């Protein structure tokens, strides 16, 4: 797995910018956000992980990966809808996986060259044209495949929960309050989010 070049610098920046994060950074200093280096796998894992716990997602993915074998679009599409769904997916998620694989085949996406030298906004706009890939899934792709350093998935349930605990003393923060707090983390909001996830779940978030 690949470690971001900005990792150490970002932790130093965040420790100074936000004292509330400093304790988290020290507690989890040995943990690093990383990329699997596989675009398709990252997207499929993000779909599997939508709105379920890290542990539940790992269980479903294990069954799915075992059935697919090598993670290639043609291998996924060679399985029937029911075979995919039987791994623990909803009907919607099953269709979303198929949609992503069809996109990879239609655009002949075989390696990183399709994504390199592009802005995240360009990649984001492409991804959300795929039915089932919304803002959150595209943001996870940016964070965990492209290793973009300044992504803030504002609708992520885990991020909201962690911020309520740390900055709201358990009270529910408004969207504007969440945005205002996150401003101090720029240009390393992806890193701040990763440590917020660690604060509520001992399992690493990894797509």
Residue ranges of model-derived segments:
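A positional/architectural concept
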Residues: 9, 15-69
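Structural motif
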Residues: 33-41, 88-91, 182-189
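Alpha-helix N-cap and coil->helix boundary residues
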Residues: 35, 55, 59, 71, ...
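Short alpha-helical scaffolding segments that buttress acidic/His motifs in well-ordered protein cores
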Residues: 43-48, 97-101, 141, 192-196
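Alpha-helical ds-nucleic-acid-binding substructure associated with the helix-hairpin-helix region
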Residues: 20, 24, 52-53, 57-129, ...
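A general alpha-helix detector
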Residues: 42-47, 79-83, 122-126, 140, ...
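C-terminal accessory module of base-excision DNA glycosylases/AP lyases that mediates lesion recognition
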Residues: 1-31, 120-121, 135-207
């Amino acid at each position: 797995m690949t470690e971001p070049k900005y990792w150490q610098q970002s932790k130093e920046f965040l420790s100074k910018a936000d004292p509330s994060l400093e304790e988290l950074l020290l507690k989890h200093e040995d943990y690093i956000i990383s990329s699997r280096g596989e675009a398709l796998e990252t997207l499929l894992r993000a779909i599997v992980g939508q709105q379920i716990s890290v542990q539940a997602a790992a269980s479903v993915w294990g069954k799915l990966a075992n059935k697919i074998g090598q993670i290639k679009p043609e291998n996924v599409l060679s399985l029937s809808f029911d075979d995919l769904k039987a791994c623990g997916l909803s009907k919607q998620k099953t269709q979303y996986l198929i949609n992503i694989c069809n996109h990879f085949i239609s655009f002949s996406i075989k390696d990183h060259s399709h994504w390199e030298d592009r802005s995240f906004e360009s990649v984001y706009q492409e991804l959300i044209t795929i039915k089932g890939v919304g803002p959150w899934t595209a943001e996870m792709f940016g964070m965990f495949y492209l290793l973009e350093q300044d992504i803030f998935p504002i609708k992520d349930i885990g991020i909201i929960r962690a911020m309520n605990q740390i900055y709201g003393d358990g009270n529910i923060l408004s969207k504007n309050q969440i945005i205002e707090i996150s401003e101090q983390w720029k240009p390393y909001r992806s890193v701040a989010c990763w440590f917020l996830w660690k604060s509520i779940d001992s399992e690493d978030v990894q797509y």
